[in-house]
C-alpha cells in the first residue's frame, strides 16, 4: 500500500499532459517588469475544457500579493477553483484541457518549458476541500513528502515534522501519538495535518480549496485562526463559498462570475464599497 501511495504521490507531483498546458506555444520565460510585492501575476488567461469546446475562464488578469490572504468568491461553477488549480498546474491532471495566456510566479512563467512542475508543486502547496490524510501514521504523513525528496536523516525529519505540526497548531494534540493512524483523527485535525504536510516542504504559497466546508464551526474557527498565523510566513490563496469567512480572514478578495473576474481589491472595499453592480448583487444575495 505504501509503495502504491508513493507512486501516486510522485505522479501527482510531477505529472503533466501533452494537451493541457499547450507547451508548444512559445512563452516568455521571465517577466522583467514583475512587481516584487507580488507572488503571482496572471495575464490574458483563458482556459478551456473538452479540447476548447467549453470555456471556463475568460481573459483573466490579476496580481496576487505576497504574504497576504486572498479569497476567491463567487457562485458555484464560476471558475474560481479552476483558476486556483492553474496556479500550480493541477489542471494538467485533467484530460482534454487547454489554455492561453501567462501565469508568472516570482518572475518566472510557470508554463515555460524551463520551469519544473515538481519544483512548482513544492513551492505552491495545495490543501483540498476534503482532508486527504494517507492511511499511515501521523508521523509518516508529514514525513512522506520529505522522504520523497530524498531526506532520510532521522534528526532532520524529527525536527521538520515537529516544526510543521507546531505551525499547523496540531503538535500539542498529537505529540504523544505520532505513531497512531492519521485517519483516526477528527475532521479538523485531519485538515490541519494536511496543512502540516504541505508546509513541511517549505512552500512559498498555500492554495486552499474550500478547506473548511466539511468542518463544524469549532474546527472551522481553528483553521481560520491558523490561516491568520500562517500568512506571516506564506501567501495564502483560498476559495470559499462563505462571504463571512472571506471578510474574516482575507486581505484581498476576488469576485468571479461566469468565468470572469468582475472585481478585485482590498476585502473591505469589495464588501463595503463595491464598484460593480454584479458585485453588489452577489454580496446582497440577489444573484448566486
Swiss-Prot record:
Entry EC number(s): 7.3.2.1
Key word Membrane present: yes
Domain ABC transporter, first and last residues per copy: 42-283
Cellular-component GO terms for this entry: plasma membrane
Alphabetical list of NCBIfam families matching this protein: 3a0107s01c2
Reaction equation(s) it catalyzes: phosphate(out) + ATP + H2O = ADP + 2 phosphate(in) + H(+)
Single GO MF annotation: ATP binding
Keyword Transit peptide tagged: no
Keywords noted in UniProt: ATP-binding, Cell membrane, Membrane, Nucleotide-binding, Phosphate transport, Translocase, Transport
Lineage: Bacteria, Bacillati, Mycoplasmatota, Mycoplasmoidales, Mycoplasmoidaceae
One GO term of the biological process aspect: phosphate ion transmembrane transport
Assembly and interaction partners: The complex is composed of two ATP-binding proteins (PstB), two transmembrane proteins (PstC and PstA) and a solute-binding protein (PstS).
Localisation: Cell membrane
Topology of this chain in the membrane: Peripheral membrane protein
Residues binding ATP: 74-81
Family: Belongs to the ABC transporter superfamily. Phosphate importer (TC 3.A.1.7) family.
Function, as annotated: Part of the ABC transporter complex PstSACB involved in phosphate import. Responsible for energy coupling to the transport system.
Protein name: Phosphate import ATP-binding protein PstB
Superkingdom of origin: Bacteria
